[in-house]
């Protein structure tokens, strides 16, 4: 069953309908006590935990009050940003985790999934602990340390509210970054839903009277983490980008650009040759994307398959031109059937 959403129309009711329809079809929105939603099931699902870690490392933020600061104290929270068109994914993740709330910021063009109660922050931290791969793990460790301090500072409390919280949280092992092979879990799928894109480029060859269709998978992130390490040194994202490049058999590119009179530096990996495209398609066929980028990937894959079957560009050029009219930023139609029975809820 496909659920179609058109840009330019009121989006929220349709998106909500599509998600609830998928849920009810699978009989897992009827009873909030369904076992698949329990922490024990998610703890047994490496794909869910690694996907969520990648998504948070790409588009998520841990906000933790500095205990040495004199500013107003606040509870820790986790905020994940989505494109407005990815509201169904945000609602889907909120529903299966039962953590936080989803806020649609139509005037700003994005959606927030915000987790800020202590128990939910603990759950998310517990689930992704051991699955992160970037310098952002520092913020997870700060969150876990905050939880440990909360337990220590309140273990003798007689307040019912605090006792209830303490009954649902516990000390966590502070685990290091995951160093397993990239292809071993769904981390790259979550990270790509946050920071990657697919391209179908069509251009005329300068020295030939012909047209070329080029396909790219591209992932770009900033070069350094915003906090210094314990020795006051910058922490680079190069190690993880180098590992991704090794997996894809490509190189890491560095670039700088100026936005609003400020210079930004980033690392990029690009799949563009036959070997790297084969690698990335095998990966995403095993661990599918879950955002609307899944639709771009399927179109990208369709053209790649035509390209591999046909030596003449003219045999599939028309299809490539047609697809580009409803692709990436020009996309106007969406469906979310790929969330139905997806690997996040299978153990």
Locate the predicted segments by residue.
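Internal intein/HINT superfamily modules and their associated LAGLIDADG
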Residues: 1-347
């Amino acid at each position: 069953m496909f659920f179609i959403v058109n840009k330019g129309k009121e989006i929220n009711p349709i998106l909500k309908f599509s998600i609830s329809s998928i849920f009810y079809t699978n009989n897992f929105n009827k009873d909030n006590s369904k076992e698949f939603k329990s922490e024990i099931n998610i703890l047994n699902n490496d794909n869910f935990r690694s996907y969520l870690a990648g998504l948070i490392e790409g588009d998520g933020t841990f906000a933790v009050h500095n205990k040495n600061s004199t500013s107003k104290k606040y509870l820790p929270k986790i905020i994940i940003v989505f494109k407005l068109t990815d509201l169904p994914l945000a609602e889907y993740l909120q529903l299966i985790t039962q953590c936080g709330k989803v806020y649609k910021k139509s005037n700003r063009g994005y959606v927030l999934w915000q987790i800020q109660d202590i128990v939910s922050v603990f759950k998310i931290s517990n689930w992704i602990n051991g699955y992160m791969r970037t310098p952002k793990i520092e913020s997870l460790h700060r969150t876990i340390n905050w939880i440990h301090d909360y337990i220590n500072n309140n273990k003798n409390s007689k307040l019912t509210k605090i006792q209830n919280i303490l009954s649902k949280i516990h000390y966590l092992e502070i685990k290091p970054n995951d160093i397993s092979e990239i292809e071993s879990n769904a981390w790259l799928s979550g990270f790509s839903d946050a920071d990657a894109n697919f391209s179908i480029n069509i251009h005329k060859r300068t020295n030939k009277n012909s047209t070329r269709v080029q396909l790219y998978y591209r992932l770009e992130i900033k070069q350094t983490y915003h906090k210094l390490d314990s020795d006051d040194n910058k922490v680079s994202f190069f190690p993880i980008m180098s590992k991704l490049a090794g997996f894809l058999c490509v190189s890491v590119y560095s670039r700088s650009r100026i936005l609003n009179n400020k210079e930004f530096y980033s690392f990029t990996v690009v799949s563009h040759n036959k070997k790297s495209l084969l690698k990335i398609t095998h990966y995403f066929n095993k661990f599918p994307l879950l955002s609307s980028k899944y639709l771009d990937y399927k179109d990208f894959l369709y053209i790649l398959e035509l390209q591999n079957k046909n030596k003449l560009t003219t045999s599939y050029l028309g299809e490539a031109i047609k697809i580009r009219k409803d692709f990436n930023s020009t996309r106007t139609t969406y469906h979310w059937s790929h969330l139905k029975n997806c690997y996040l809820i299978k153990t």
